[in-house]
């Protein structure tokens, strides 16, 4: 089980959740995503990892409650648990360092 440590409503129907997931936080890189399952039988919801904190062992997701599953997920609060969070998935972003002249 993965505990929601913090939930904020950033704008109407747009939510931020900080989730306790130490192994995921240690492996996450910019540009990757994760998959949330609220219950064992619920839909798999892919979401971008918005932030991660290795020391705290947390990852942050931001989502808009527009479909049935994300609307249901928006009703979860700090202290509630997700059945499963899988990740990090996907290829990390590649950073290109350009000089100020380029």
Question: What do the PLM-derived regions correspond to, one by one?
Answer:
Residues 1-78:
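Ferredoxin-reductase
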Residues 71-102:
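FNR/FR-type flavoprotein reductase catalytic core
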């Amino acid at each position: 089980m993965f505990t929601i440590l913090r939930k904020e409503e950033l704008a109407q129907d747009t939510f931020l959740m900080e989730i306790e997931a130490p192994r995921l936080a240690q492996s996450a890189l910019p540009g990757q995503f994760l998959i949330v399952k609220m219950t064992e039988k619920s839909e798999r919801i892919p979401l971008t990892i918005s932030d991660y904190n290795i020391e705290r062992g947390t990852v942050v997701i931001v989502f808009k409650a527009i479909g049935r599953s994300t609307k249901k997920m928006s009703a979860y609060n700090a202290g509630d648990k997700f059945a499963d969070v899988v990740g990090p998935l996907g290829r990390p972003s590649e950073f290109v360092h350009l000089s100020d002249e380029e």
